[in-house]
Structures are given as C-alpha cells and as structure tokens.
C-alpha cells in the first residue's frame, strides 16, 4: 500500500473520530482528532470545514476563518467553507464582536498574569455577557473565581462552558474543584 493512500486512510479515521466527538459535544476532543487528521492529509477539506465549525462554536472565530479560507483555497468548487464564510460575513457585527472579544480576552490574560485579577475579572465578566460562547474566556473567568475562592461563581462559568464543550478536560477539572469546595461533589 502506498504511503499517500495509507495517510488518507489514517486521516479519514481521525476525521470520523472527530465527527463523532463533535456530535457528542466533545468539542475539545474533536479539535484534537481533526488536527491529527490534517497532519496526515492537509488537503482534507471536510476535516478543515468541521474544525472551522467547531472553532466558531467555541468562540474562536479567527481560527475558524483561517480553516475555512485554507479549505476554500484547496478546493474552490463544491466547498461548504464558502457558505460558512458567507454566513459569518452576513451576520451584522459578528466579526467585530468576535474581534473585540479576542482583544478583551488577551487583555484580561495580561491582567491576570500581572496579578491584577480584579481588572481581569471585570473585563471577563463583561466579555462573557457579550460573547458567552467563548469557552476560553469562561474558563479563565472560572479560574480567577477559583483563585478568589468564589466557588459558586466559578461553577456557573464552568457550567456555561460545559454547555458548549461537554468534555473539555480543563473545565471538568476546574468543575471538580468547585464542586468539592461547595460541598456538591458527587
């Protein structure tokens, strides 16, 4: 069997795993599987398109756009990426909102790294109100709440993140900590 054929088969297997994980809302697991798929076959537009959809779902719009543009460049005809890009551009203010969310997240991360947790918390609170599907922001806000020992607020953020990405390992870990400290551990 030729290497190219074998690589495509492995890529398809990882794509199928990613598709199943996405269907069960294990979006972080799906991202991992789809990235592996693309390592074996970078021309697999179905994997790129699904990866873009997942990135968009978890609030990482820039990464979603990147995957769809690459996909469209690889296959110009009969490609769903064209429709996805059209829908994102047609949604009034969506790209601007996503861009502002990413900037606020990065600023909050800098605040948190420089021991300015209050400003980071305030910025993230406003951000997740405007852009609640940004899982990383929910996760960082919950982590700040955990550090401040406000386990109930942390649990609320983590619950919102788990509604989007049901099996995110870090969110599940932080949720265990929050539950343990609120007495709600199972």
Regions found by a protein language model. Name each.
Residues 1-13, 89-103:
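TPR-adjacent "capping" and linker segments in tetratricopeptide-repeat scaffold/adaptor proteins
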Residues 4, 11-12, 45-46, 79-80, ...:
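Helix-start (N-cap) detector for alpha-helical repeat units in TPR-like alpha-solenoids
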Residues 5, 36-39, 70-73, 128-129, ...:
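Conserved structural position within tetratricopeptide repeats
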Residues 23, 57, 74, 90-94, ...:
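Register position in tetratricopeptide repeats
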